[in-house]
C-alpha cells in the first residue's frame, strides 16, 4: 500500500478535531512545501524520531550509453538522501516481525 498526500489529509481530519478537509489538505501541502524549499535552499532537515533528509554532492563520473556502449560523462549533481532514525527502523522491524 502507498500512502498519498490525500490520505494523509484524511487521517488529519479523522484524528484532529475541528480540522476541515480543505484545511488538512493545505496543512499537508504546506508541510511538504517547507521540506522542498528548505532542501532547495541547501539546508538539511532533521525530524526527531523519523529521520534526516541530507544533501550530497556527487562528482562527475563516466557512464555508458547502454545501446551503443559509448562512454558518456555523467555531470556532477546534488542529490537528496534520506536516513531513517533508529526509532523508525526499530518500529518498522517490529511491525515486520509481527507480520511473519
UniProtKB/Swiss-Prot annotation:
Signal peptide positions on this chain: none
**Source species, domain of life:** Bacteria
Q: Which GO terms describe its cellular component?
A: cytosol
> CDD domains under this entry?
IHF_A (cd13835)
The record's annotation in PROSITE patterns points to:
HISTONE_LIKE
Which segments cross the bilayer? none
Q: Which GO terms describe its biological process?
A: DNA recombination; positive regulation of metabolic process; regulation of DNA-templated transcription; regulation of translation
UniProt keyword list: DNA recombination, DNA-binding, Transcription, Transcription regulation, Translation regulation
- One annotated GO molecular function: structural constituent of chromatin
Family indicated by similarity = Belongs to the bacterial histone-like protein family.
Q: What does this protein do?
A: This protein is one of the two subunits of integration host factor, a specific DNA-binding protein that functions in genetic recombination as well as in transcriptional and translational control.
The record, for NCBIfam families, names: himA (TIGR00987), PRK00285.1 (NF001401)
Query: Protein name, please?
Result: Integration host factor subunit alpha
Q: Which organism is it from?
A: Neisseria meningitidis serogroup B (strain ATCC BAA-335 / MC58)
Amino acid at each position: 500500500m502507498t500512502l498519498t498526500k490525500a490520505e494523509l489529509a484524511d487521517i488529519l481530519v479523522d484524528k484532529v478535531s475541528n480540522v476541515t478537509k480543505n484545511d488538512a489538505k493545505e496543512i499537508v501541502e504546506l508541510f511538504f512545501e517547507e521540506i522542498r524549499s528548505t532542501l532547495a535552499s541547501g539546508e538539511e532537515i532533521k525530524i526527531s524520531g523519523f529521520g534526516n533528509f541530507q544533501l550530497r554532492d556527487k562528482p562527475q563520473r563516466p557512464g555508458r550509453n547502454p545501446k551503443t556502449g559509448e562512454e558518456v560523462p555523467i555531470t556532477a549533481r546534488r542529490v537528496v538522501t534520506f536516513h531513517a532514525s533508529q526509532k523508525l527502523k526499530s518500529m518498522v522491524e517490529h511491525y515486520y516481525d509481527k507480520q511473519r
